[in-house]
A protein has these predicted regions:
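Alpha-helical metal-binding/catalytic segments enriched in His/Glu/Asp
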Residues: 132-191
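Acidic/His- and Gly-rich active-site-bordering loop/insert found
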Residues: 39, 65, 108-139
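N-terminal capping segment at the start of a domain
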Residues: 21, 26-52, 68-78, 218
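Second-shell loop/turn segments in exported
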Residues: 20-25, 43-52, 103-106, 144-153, ...
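Bacterial Sec-dependent N-terminal signal peptides
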Residues: 1-23
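Metal-dependent peptidase/peptidase-like ectodomains
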Residues: 186-277
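Conserved small/polar residues in nucleotide/adenosyl-binding loops
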Residues: 279-281
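A non-catalytic alpha/beta surface segment that caps or lines the substrate-entry region
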Residues: 47-119
Length: 281
């Protein structure tokens, strides 16, 4: 988990130096687990978008941004609120192959959610923006069964929160990123990628100035294709150009040493992960 977060932290600098190593080392594994434990606790009832647990999670993330020194982006708020129509579904997870089967039981439901925005201004290239996203909503609960969503995607949100803190430590010591960074945990993902779609249609910062979106999902997942946890699936890094793909390869080969797995970076993959990743772009 730590190595995966390190590569995500370094890419926005588009370089790797002793300062970058120093600030990546400020990421604390215990803090990561603390964030995951809180976000996936029963008290948040699975963080279904529009429900009280999702609102509690949003405020928890916003308070973290405030505590590490990220200012509210406008009108003294960290939230981009949205209201959309969506279908609601229950997913059953097959433990053998992690296939999700959806049963639709209500449509035309009004969903009210929030994206949480933490903006860190850059230096000489501050008009260019890199967005780091992770969805903080999950499936909620069904009767007495709570879908806690520790890995999907409290783990990714915890990573994004720690990346934000590392950037702020670097910035306060005069080593902030050249490009501006938007750390944006989104909601509505389990309802149909609603939060990320809403931001794309209603961007706070011009899309033409956004040069990359790095999305984090399930950074604690282990599977049968790898004999250890030192790997990451990369999807969509070569969609618009090879620049991000080549940067991933270069930084990883020199400094990180992860197994970069591209098996799902395929338009023909039946899981359609490649297609879903493009919606975030």
């Amino acid at each position: 988990m730590r190595s995966i977060i390190n590569i995500l932290l370094v890419i926005p600098f588009f370089s790797f130096s002793q300062e970058n190593i120093k600030y990546s080392n400020t990421i604390n594994i215990n803090d990561l687990y603390d964030h995951i434990e809180i976000l996936s606790s029963d008290s948040l009832e699975g963080r279904e978008t529009g429900k009280p647990g999702q609102k509690m999670a949003a405020h928890y993330i916003a308070n973290h941004f405030k505590n590490i020194g990220i200012p509210a982006f406008k009108r003294n708020t960290y939230f981009q609120k949205f209201k959309v129509k969506s279908q609601r579904h229950v997913c059953k997870c097959d433990d053998c192959d992690l296939t999700f089967f959806k049963r639709i039981f209500k449509s035309n439901q009004t969903i009210r959610g929030e994206n949480v925005l933490g903006y860190i201004e850059g230096t000489d290239l501050k008009d260019e923006l890199i967005i780091i996203t992770a969805h903080y909503d999950h499936l909620g609960k069904h009767d007495s069964l709570i879908f806690n969503g520790a890995d999907d995607d409290a783990s990714g949100v915890a990573g994004a929160m720690e990346i934000a803190e590392a950037f702020m430590i670097a910035k306060k010591e005069g080593y902030g990123p050249r490009r501006s960074i938007l750390i944006m945990p989104v909601s509505g993902e389990e309802k149909g990628l609603l939060g990320s779609e809403y931001y794309t249609d209603n961007p706070i910062y011009p899309l033409e100035n956004t040069i990359a979106n790095l999305n984090i999902d399930m950074i604690g997942r282990l599977d049968d294709w790898h004999d250890n946890g030192n790997y990451v699936y990369l999807i969509g890094s070569d969609r618009l150009s090879l620049e991000l793909h080549n940067l991933n390869e270069e930084i990883n080969a020199k400094y990180i040493g992860l197994d970069l797995d591209y098996r799902f970076n395929d338009e023909e993959d039946p899981n359609r992960y490649y297609y879903l990743s493009l919606i975030h772009i």
